[in-house]
Amino acid sequence: MSWAFRTRFKKEIVAEFLPPARLGKKQKVIILCDGMPSIPRKQPLMEFLARKGYWVFYPRYRGAWESGGKFLERSPHKDILDVIDELPKGIRELAFGKRFALKPDEIFVIGGSFGGAAAILASLDNRVKKVIANCPVVDWKILAAEERLETSNPNYAAYIRAAFGNGYRLSDRNWRKLHGGRFYNPAAHVSEIDSAKIMMFHAQDDPYVPYKSVKNFADRTGVKLNSFARGGHLSTEMIVQKYWKRIKKFFG
């Protein structure tokens, strides 16, 4: 695998990045949005996309892993928008200070599960051309049931602190925001969604993100949903690589 560079946006958001393996007429950027909880391991997907001619950025949300701040202090999709804010200024990698000039012509976002919500909400920004949302959380009404699938601890935030240490600096208060129905919730923005900008993938037997919630979101918004009878909680890396021709055509 290619060695990914590292940079920092807005002084807090650490991101790995790769320049495109070959230069094209346009500077195309893909930003990857991680699930949660998860370990940062999308580097093979970064390399795959860089070989396809894209700049690839893989940020850590504020309060997660290498980034500064507190997790869910603000909506994670705003961290993605902060990255987009900074891209036209050029990128300075952290190890040796090498600078990369970048003036994005097109920006795409790919997110899975928890990160699928970030991708969908990022699509509301007119700088984002298209997004891919894989097995995305589209409505946090699922949260109480989903928590019980992951842990017997009645305090999910306490479980995360115990199991992931400082991987997530997560307070009980910030986690409770997700139960409110508006914070970081695509379902609260149904009327604003541009269905032409979003493509979703989801398996009907997903044990964590109920297919019914995603199908309902697709029906209400007109977003294209690629459904699979089986597959469980689908891997974003697998989906992007296996269905790249379909995704590339959608990107336009």
Language model segments and positions:
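N-terminal cap/lid segment of alpha/beta-hydrolase-fold proteins
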Residues: 1-25
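Short beta-strand element of the alpha/beta-hydrolase
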Residues: 25-35
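Conserved alpha/beta-hydrolase
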Residues: 49-68
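Alpha/beta-hydrolase active-site loop
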Residues: 71-101
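Hydrolase active-site cap/lid region
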Residues: 121-173
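Short beta-strand/loop motif that positions the catalytic acidic residue
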Residues: 193-194, 199-202, 206
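Conserved alpha/beta-hydrolase "acid-adjacent" motif
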Residues: 207-213
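Catalytic histidine-centered segment of alpha/beta-hydrolase-like enzymes
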Residues: 231-242
